[in-house]
Amino acid sequence: MTSDPSPWYLGLDTATPWLALALWSPAGADGATDVVHRHAIDLGRDLAGALMGELDAFVRAHDVAPEALRAIGVGVGPGSFTGIRIGIAAALGLGRGLGVAVAGAGTLEALALAGLDDGEVGWSAIDARRGAVYAGRFRRIGDDIDVLEEGRRRPRAEVPPGARLVEGIAPDAFHAARAARAGAPLLPRYG
């Protein structure tokens, strides 16, 4: 593993069928630029069995030593109840083992980051079954997401027809990595 002293933040999101991972090393006082590595794979029901192997391979592929991790951010939903629990349990286990803090990040916001262009306003949604979605309205500004309408479970018909809609893609785990650095609270949003 690398001897690079740069701090790294790990983000992961498992609230959808996708396993989304990110490693982020923010720009330092030395003028270095941010480094972000992303990986997403649709694991569906294989998430629990594949998570740790995928995570280990991802971190090794980018040559980041475990001791370089400063904090871990995890997607807290809304979304799959089981997926959220798997992600939070993995993050807490890693955090405890590495002696680092674990923070929470909204999955709808991570979807907005993945699917909206800079300055764009739109809805992000996750299927909640029975004609409902977990959905919220957001604006992307650079790597930040402004919440315009809080995410919640609602009938799909409440999402305006023709509105910009982000769904069915992997959330951007960079959102969780940034939440790790900010020390966001770890509060699950099961829906």
PLM features per residue range, with description:
Residues 39, 69-72, 189:
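Generic beta-strand hydrophobic packing signal
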Residues 1-35, 42-50, 103-191:
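Oxyanion-binding and handling regions
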Residues 55-71, 140:
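Phosphate/pyrophosphate-binding loops at sites that engage ATP/ADP/AMP, CoA/4′-phosphopantetheine
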Residues 70-104:
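DPxDG-like acidic metal-binding loop motif
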Residues 50-53, 89, 93, 110:
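Short amphipathic alpha-helical face segments that pack within enzyme cores
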Residues 60-63, 96, 116-117, 182:
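Residue-level signal for alpha-helix termini/capping positions
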Residues 38-43, 76-80:
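A short glycine/serine-rich beta->alpha loop
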